[in-house]
Amino acid sequence: MDIEKRILELREILNYHSHKYYVEDAPEISDFEYDELYRELEKLEQERPDLITPDSPTQRIGGKPLEGFKKVVHAVQMQSLSDVFSREELLAFDRRVREAVGDDVEYVVEKKIDGLSVSLVYENGVFTRGATRGDGLVGEDVTQNLKTIRTIPLRLKRDLPLLEVRGEVFISKKDFIKINEEQEAAGQQLFANPRNAAAGSLRQLDPKVTSQRKLDIFVFNIQRIEGQSFKTHSETLEFLKELGFKTSPGYKVCKDINAVWEEINRIGEERGEIDFEIDGAVVKVNSLEQREILGSTIKAPRWAVAYKYPAEVKETVVKKITVNVGRTGVLTPIAIFDPVRLAGSTVSRATLHNMDYIKEKDIRIGDTVRIRKAGDIIPEVVDVVFEKRSGNEAEFNMPEQCPVCGADVVREEGEAAYRCTGIECSAQLYRKIVHFASRDAMNIEGLGPAIIEVLLEKGLIKEIADLYYLHKEKETLVNIERMGKKSVENLLASIEKSKQNNIDRLIFGFGIRHIGLRAAQLLSENFESLDALMNASAEDIMAIPEFGEKMAKSVEQFFRQKQNRDTVEKLKAAGVNTVSFGKKKIKDNRFEGKTFVLTGTLPSFTRKEAEEIIKSFGGKTSGSVSKKTDYVLAGEDAGSKLQKAKELGIEIIDEDKFRKMIE
């Protein structure tokens, strides 16, 4: 096989299907088939690293966390827009435009996406740099994080010498809700709105975290270009589509300001139904020649304005407070109130987040409350109208048993969240199975989120253990759209293979609160079987030096639940290993008691590979340099850690020295 030819072919195939899926929303192959092609490319590139290029689909997610963001001076200033808040102000803008360029003016109206503005630079058709807007003159280099956004092409469909475009990075309303559910489940601070979530995700130092946040982008302007010219803005938008960009959705060319006003009203009526947050409508002069005449002020162009929609607040009465159990097991109180029309839709419920939120606002059943839509998306209770309180209102208390499965509900000290402890609670099953099948848990290849959703929808799995009985449903699986015989055979083989895992993977796969990979390994090393662990008390578990009371009680609480014990029995009946392989022996402990810190890029090791080698010799790794650090392993572009090591007199080694140490 000609490896170079096959690599080029695979890149072309993967780029085509990625565009069909992420930009056009019209997939032609299954997720499993895409993953198999991706893995083939990954394998070939590992064999021939000299053929890896920056625009390869495998290079979207960087291998190592960054130590900071470099500053970028924008070649073209990224200006903001002047705001208008009424029809009168819009008409005044139109008068100023016509006074400067005459009455023959055409406008383009676009939705104003409420996200984070970025610039993307392409050289000879390849994405080379991306930066945040910053103050408009200087931004931050976030190239590696932008590469994780699937709707940003790494290579254009035309090899233009130079192209710089501007776009808005955002998170859809649906994904924003999921992210906040995950934040809440992890006991972390919630994002106030999708814009904050997008900004926080794009500025993560670890691109792998960014890649999990489902960021998206709409590209809406050409900042500079070589090898092409245009007469109108609408022409540039169509050209950007041809290059492979996802552009401003549903823009409209308007012949006069009255048509502009009609379009603004239409967008305003529909904004509650759009799956991304908008904070207005942008009105732009279409003619690029007229734009040149109009020019700009220091901060904003004279040829465009942003119309901002007014916020709505309504009063209603809380009829009852129910409890929703999320995919992570967190119980969330929901206020049910008299239906009201708000921001384009009728709403009758709003999340109350947790008991701390309810107590802080003193919300009671029967209260008159004021509500609004945060960012025109999520209904929220602003406050209680205390002057309308009658004295007959009732306080709300969180249930002690899960309303879905009946398992115990617990609230750990220092946390706001109440959680269901049942592993097979149907409300949280999807997330549990995704985690159970993940690489660090049972490592079931081919069982990704999309396949799991299908299996749940078809009723083929109702609990984790059902995965190991799927072979009985082979004919049904083969007939499911986008799966096929080969995909099903591979999936079933992977499930069968996972039965032989050590129990540390199974323990981690259960998703027990506070039990990560290392904790699961320690439990496996200290208990000979899952039965022994299930019958252990918190005191028994705390005999492991690394285990504190919180971790030990979490394990005890988990295995105390009958449904969790039943799951273990069903797994055993299916042939899943529940006996420990014993403590992993370190053959060579030359690094015992030594702590390493890694910084920069190593020529031939990934950071994870180097860390695993250090641990295999009994050493430890740390993310920061201190007096307790023994060695700093430094590669190219080493950052502040290297400087701190020099200041503290820590021994600094390069890859060559490291190789000699492990020979």
Curated annotation (Swiss-Prot):
InterPro entries: BRCT_dom, BRCT_dom_sf, DisA/LigA_HHH, DNA_ligase, DNA_ligase_AS, DNAligase_adenylation, DNAligase_N, Hlx-hairpin-Hlx_DNA-bd_motif
Catalytic activity: NAD(+) + (deoxyribonucleotide)n-3'-hydroxyl + 5'-phospho-(deoxyribonucleotide)m = (deoxyribonucleotide)n+m + AMP + beta-nicotinamide D-nucleotide
Catalytic residues in the record: K112 (n6-amp-lysine intermediate)
UniProt entry tagged with the keyword Metal-binding: yes
Pfam (any one): HHH_2
Keyword annotations: DNA damage, DNA repair, DNA replication, Ligase, Magnesium, Manganese, Metal-binding, NAD, Zinc
Primary enzyme class: ligase
Stretches assigned to the BRCT domain: 586-663
GO biological process terms held by the UniProt record: DNA repair; DNA replication
EC number of this enzyme: 6.5.1.2
Cofactor: Mg(2+); Mn(2+)
Residues engaged in binding Zn(2+): C402, C405, C420, C425
Binding residues annotated for NAD(+), in chain numbering: D31, F32, E33, Y34, D35, S80, L81, E110, R133, E168, K284, K308
GO MF annotation list: DNA binding; DNA ligase (NAD+) activity; metal ion binding
NCBIfam families documented for this protein: dnlj (TIGR00575), PRK07956.1 (NF005932)
Protein role: DNA ligase that catalyzes the formation of phosphodiester linkages between 5'-phosphoryl and 3'-hydroxyl groups in double-stranded DNA using NAD as a coenzyme and as the energy source for the reaction. It is essential for DNA replication and repair of damaged DNA.
PANTHER family: CHROMOSOME TRANSMISSION FIDELITY FACTOR 18, REPLICATION FACTOR C SUBUNIT 1
Family: Belongs to the NAD-dependent DNA ligase family. LigA subfamily.
Protein's name in the database: DNA ligase
